[in-house]
């Protein structure tokens, strides 16, 4: 850290009125490209228009202009998010049974969508309890609203209006910061200021304001709700905020005001800032006093972090200095040159952010069931399954996106002349060793993980159960995972003496939390079946990484195509006369990576769904006997491929297949329709472009005969376009099929 004299002059970091506001461009599709602006001569035009409309790099080379467009587009994105969020709250206010659910969350199911009768589809309005007919929702909004302290549909309505106001504000900001006061490039590149503001402002003050809301509004309201007070009798949020005596009745330390804070007797506040661990036995969620404490602690951390970087005051860290000092004995120039990359290539910046956010999203998926954060979330099995599946899918897509933008960076923004012997250069120079080793790992994992299943299927088919890998024959116990579980389960008495319970009930310890005779959470046993499927996870993840990493490391050149960088991010083949060079572009690696990402996530969500139904979810009798939904069949059935097909896919598909004529029938139709969408994708993936061009020309001939030929000449999709349409339908069909299968099943039995 260095101290230097502050710079006296104030920098002007915006440009006034750079681009005049005009609707003329809206009337000219493709205005950003000379070729596209001419209008369509063939049907390829509409595909190119969609491919390039948001590729700001292709509109201009001016980094400042690109940065402004991205910045402005982000405000548009935020506006859409606020409108969507507002819609969710509006549905809660106008079409939901939220108030009824709030009064009896264990027997009434959440619903916020009522279908209008047009052709008989009002059959979808099932009886969710409390005299309400509607579609059961599994988004978790009701649980989130209760945790926030929302007690009436009027409050939801007000929040929905607030969301629209914010959306309008964002749309205005997007226009203002592009047309009226656009930031200069230097502003986008001022990383120290950006870090300070994002860390202290967004994360620090954001967490602090949420902690404040939790303490002053959520905690008292939830305390009263847990005690069984009628929501209509509970004081309104502003009464708690303005009247300290009301809060002091529930949390005595409030009567002392800020004195304990300034006299450093912070433990006085332990009545509302707790460190209990475990779950609230009334709601089956984390103690909200624990989460308030957590957000306050996070706020302090980020407020400190937001004061670490050197800006106008000449004190603090410089990011460039940190990176350039970061070198070890074996890493050459270390991180030298990365600062220049991250301040001039938004693709590089985005790739890192997507990789981290994707990983974080997957971590969130796992925490949502292991440490259910909201009241009555853990016993709403449909919502638990939906939240896990949703966050896993999102995480998978973000990680593939990280590889895509890393490859775009390599092709468009990487300058080999400025990167010498730093870590990026060194990784690129031994890429052959990396990829060949990774390939070996994939082969090893694939043969061994699959081989264990094949062995079990064979022994099972031959009637030799004693020779199978199972918990009752040849055991392959996940000893490392069990060791980690045990250390965490024992922590409260040993390594974490102040904690009253372990971080998650899933670690072990024998406690069962049941809410309304349903299991919220209990210790999750791991055995041979988990060991087998874990290695399938390892296999699919490593193959996904192999494909994506190969795409990035060979994006600029390879032995096959040394001048690949000149061909761009996506290209079908290396020109005529060079056979065997198709499907090698960085784009094609992203395309292939998406399929393996789909494989990976499918195995994970299947594992989760079956494991939870078999070993966690279920009912508990007054004698304390737990009856699981599928009766603990995971350990015995998930050790063969046949078991997965017969006892998971087929057995649990009965609800979606037999849903016709019931309120779940929409899932039956989706299941069928999504299979069709998936099958439709194969038509694009398995067929060549020439086949379609030939067919089109024959059809055009017939139109010419009848003098009804179109002015815009029809053309077959290019190879790349066909693959894009194919993978989109493959993923859409696959995801919607899984969605229908999961929800019909879990709503029927959960």
Curated annotation (Swiss-Prot):
<keyword id="KW-0560">Oxidoreductase</keyword>
<dbReference type="GO" id="GO:0016491">
    <property type="term" value="F:oxidoreductase activity"/>
</dbReference>
<comment type="function">
    <text>PsaA and PsaB bind P700, the primary electron donor of photosystem I (PSI), as well as the electron acceptors A0, A1 and FX. PSI is a plastocyanin-ferredoxin oxidoreductase, converting photonic excitation into a charge separation, which transfers an electron from the donor P700 chlorophyll pair to the spectroscopically characterized acceptors A0, A1, FX, FA and FB in turn. Oxidized P700 is reduced on the lumenal side of the thylakoid membrane by plastocyanin.</text>
</comment>
<keyword id="KW-0812">Transmembrane</keyword>
<feature type="binding site" description="axial binding residue">
    <location>
        <position position="675"/>
    </location>
    <ligand>
        <name>chlorophyll a'</name>
    </ligand>
</feature>
<keyword id="KW-0157">Chromophore</keyword>
<feature type="transmembrane region" description="Helical; Name=IV">
    <location>
        <begin position="291"/>
        <end position="309"/>
    </location>
</feature>
<dbReference type="GO" id="GO:0016168">
    <property type="term" value="F:chlorophyll binding"/>
</dbReference>
<keyword id="KW-0460">Magnesium</keyword>
<dbReference type="GO" id="GO:0009522">
    <property type="term" value="C:photosystem I"/>
</dbReference>
<keyword id="KW-0004">4Fe-4S</keyword>
<feature type="binding site">
    <location>
        <position position="582"/>
    </location>
    <ligand>
        <name>[4Fe-4S] cluster</name>
    </ligand>
</feature>
<feature type="binding site">
    <location>
        <position position="573"/>
    </location>
    <ligand>
        <name>[4Fe-4S] cluster</name>
    </ligand>
</feature>
<protein>
    <recommendedName>
        <fullName>Photosystem I P700 chlorophyll a apoprotein A1</fullName>
        <ecNumber>1.97.1.12</ecNumber>
    </recommendedName>
</protein>
<keyword id="KW-0934">Plastid</keyword>
<dbReference type="GO" id="GO:0009055">
    <property type="term" value="F:electron transfer activity"/>
</dbReference>
<keyword id="KW-0793">Thylakoid</keyword>
<feature type="binding site">
    <location>
        <position position="692"/>
    </location>
    <ligand>
        <name>phylloquinone</name>
    </ligand>
</feature>
<dbReference type="InterPro" id="IPR020586">
    <property type="entry name" value="PSI_PsaA/B_CS"/>
</dbReference>
<keyword id="KW-0603">Photosystem I</keyword>
<feature type="transmembrane region" description="Helical; Name=II">
    <location>
        <begin position="156"/>
        <end position="179"/>
    </location>
</feature>
<keyword id="KW-1133">Transmembrane helix</keyword>
<keyword id="KW-0408">Iron</keyword>
<keyword id="KW-0411">Iron-sulfur</keyword>
<dbReference type="GO" id="GO:0051539">
    <property type="term" value="F:4 iron, 4 sulfur cluster binding"/>
</dbReference>
<keyword id="KW-0602">Photosynthesis</keyword>
<feature type="transmembrane region" description="Helical; Name=X">
    <location>
        <begin position="664"/>
        <end position="686"/>
    </location>
</feature>
<keyword id="KW-0813">Transport</keyword>
<feature type="transmembrane region" description="Helical; Name=I">
    <location>
        <begin position="70"/>
        <end position="93"/>
    </location>
</feature>
<keyword id="KW-0479">Metal-binding</keyword>
<keyword id="KW-0148">Chlorophyll</keyword>
<dbReference type="Pfam" id="PF00223">
    <property type="entry name" value="PsaA_PsaB"/>
</dbReference>
<keyword id="KW-0150">Chloroplast</keyword>
<comment type="subunit">
    <text>The PsaA/B heterodimer binds the P700 chlorophyll special pair and subsequent electron acceptors. PSI consists of a core antenna complex that captures photons, and an electron transfer chain that converts photonic excitation into a charge separation. The eukaryotic PSI reaction center is composed of at least 11 subunits.</text>
</comment>
<feature type="transmembrane region" description="Helical; Name=III">
    <location>
        <begin position="195"/>
        <end position="219"/>
    </location>
</feature>
<dbReference type="InterPro" id="IPR001280">
    <property type="entry name" value="PSI_PsaA/B"/>
</dbReference>
<feature type="transmembrane region" description="Helical; Name=VIII">
    <location>
        <begin position="531"/>
        <end position="549"/>
    </location>
</feature>
<feature type="transmembrane region" description="Helical; Name=VII">
    <location>
        <begin position="433"/>
        <end position="455"/>
    </location>
</feature>
<feature type="binding site" description="axial binding residue">
    <location>
        <position position="683"/>
    </location>
    <ligand>
        <name>chlorophyll a</name>
    </ligand>
</feature>
<keyword id="KW-0472">Membrane</keyword>
<feature type="binding site">
    <location>
        <position position="691"/>
    </location>
    <ligand>
        <name>chlorophyll a</name>
    </ligand>
</feature>
<dbReference type="InterPro" id="IPR006243">
    <property type="entry name" value="PSI_PsaA"/>
</dbReference>
């Amino acid at each position: 850290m260095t101290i230097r004299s502050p710079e006296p002059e104030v920098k002007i970091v915006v440009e006034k009125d750079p681009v005049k506001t005009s609707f003329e461009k809206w009337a000219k599709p493709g205005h950003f490209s000379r070729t596209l602006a001419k209008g369509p001569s063939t049907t390829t035009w509409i595909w190119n228009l969609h491919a390039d409309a948001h590729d700001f790099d292709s509109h201009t080379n001016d980094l400042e202009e690109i940065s402004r467009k991205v910045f402005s587009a982000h405000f548009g994105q935020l506006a859409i998010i606020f409108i969507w969020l507002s819609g969710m709250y509006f549905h809660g206010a106008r079409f939901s049974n939220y108030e009824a659910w709030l009064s009896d969350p264990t027997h009434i199911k959440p619903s916020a969508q009522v279908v209008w009768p047009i052709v008989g589809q009002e059959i979808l309005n099932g009886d969710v309890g409390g005299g309400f007919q509607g579609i059961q929702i599994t988004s978790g909004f009701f649980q989130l609203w209760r945790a926030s302290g929302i007690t009436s549909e009027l409050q939801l309505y007000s929040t929905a209006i607030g969301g629209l106001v914010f959306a309008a504000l964002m749309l205005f900001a997007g226009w203002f910061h592009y047309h009226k006061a656009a930031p200069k490039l230097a502003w986008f590149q001022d990383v120290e200021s950006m870090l300070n503001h994002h860390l202290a402002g967004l994360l620090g003050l954001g967490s602090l304001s949420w902690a404040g809301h939790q303490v002053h509004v959520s905690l008292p309201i939830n305390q009263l709700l847990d005690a069984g007070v009628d929501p209509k009798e509970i004081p309104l949020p502003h009464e708690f905020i303005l009247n300290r005596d009301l809060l002091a009745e529930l949390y005595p330390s409030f009567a002392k005001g800020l004195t304990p804070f300034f006299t450093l007797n912070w433990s006085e506040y332990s009545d509302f800032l707790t460190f209990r661990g475990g779950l609230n036995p009334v709601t089956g969620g984390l103690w909200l006093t624990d989460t308030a404490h957590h957000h306050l602690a996070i706020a302090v951390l980020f407020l400190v972090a937001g004061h670490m970087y050197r800006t106008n005051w000449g004190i603090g860290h410089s990011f460039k200095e940190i990176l350039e000092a970061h070198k070890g004995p074996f890493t050459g120039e270390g991180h030298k040159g990365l600062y220049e990359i991250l301040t001039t290539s938004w693709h590089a910046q985005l790739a890192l952010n997507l990789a981290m956010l994707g990983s974080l999203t997957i971590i969130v998926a796992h925490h949502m069931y292991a440490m259910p954060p909201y009241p009555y979330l853990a016993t709403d099995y449909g919502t638990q399954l939906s939240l896990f599946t949703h966050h896993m899918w999102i995480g998978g897509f973000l990680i593939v996106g990280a590889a895509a933008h890393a490859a775009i960076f390599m092709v468009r923004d990487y300058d080999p002349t400025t990167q010498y012997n730093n870590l990026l250069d060194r990784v690129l120079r031994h890429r052959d060793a990396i990829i060949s080793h990774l390939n070996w790992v994939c082969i090893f994992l694939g043969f061994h993980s699959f081989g264990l299943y094949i062995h079990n299927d064979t022994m099972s088919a031959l009637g030799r159960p004693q020779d199978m890998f199972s918990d009752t024959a040849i055991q392959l116990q996940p000893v490392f995972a069990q060791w980690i579980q045990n250390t965490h389960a024992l922590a409260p008495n040993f390594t974490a003496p102040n904690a009253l319970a372990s971080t998650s009930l899933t670690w072990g310890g024998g406690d069962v939390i049941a809410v309304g005779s349903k299991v919220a959470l209990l210790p999750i046993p791991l055995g041979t079946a988990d060991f087998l499927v874990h290695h399938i996870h390892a296999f699919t993840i490593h193959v996904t990484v192999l494909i994506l990493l190969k795409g990035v490391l060979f994006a600029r050149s390879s032995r096959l195509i040394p001048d690949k960088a000149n061909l761009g991010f996506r290209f079908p083949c290396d020109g005529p006369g060079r056979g065997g060079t198709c499907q090698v572009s960085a784009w094609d690696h992203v395309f292939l990576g998406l399929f393996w990402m789909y494989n990976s996530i499918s195995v994970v969500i299947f594992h989760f769904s079956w494991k939870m139904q078999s070993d966690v979810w279920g009912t508990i009798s007054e004698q304390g006997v737990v009856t699981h939904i599928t009766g603990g069949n995971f350990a015995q059935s998930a050790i063969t491929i046949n078991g997965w097909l017969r006892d998971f896919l087929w057995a649990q598909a009965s609800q979606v297949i037999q849903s016709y004529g019931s309120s779940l029938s929409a899932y039956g139709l989706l299941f069928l329709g999504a299979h069709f969408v998936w099958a439709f994708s194969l038509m694009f993936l398995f067929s060549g472009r020439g086949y379609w061009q030939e067919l089109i020309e024959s059809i055009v001939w017939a139109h010419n005969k009848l003098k009804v030929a179109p002015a815009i000449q029809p053309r077959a999709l290019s190879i790349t376009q066909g693959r894009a349409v194919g993978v989109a339908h493959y993923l859409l069909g696959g995801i919607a099929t899984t969605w229908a299968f999961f929800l019909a099943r879990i709503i029927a039995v959960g």
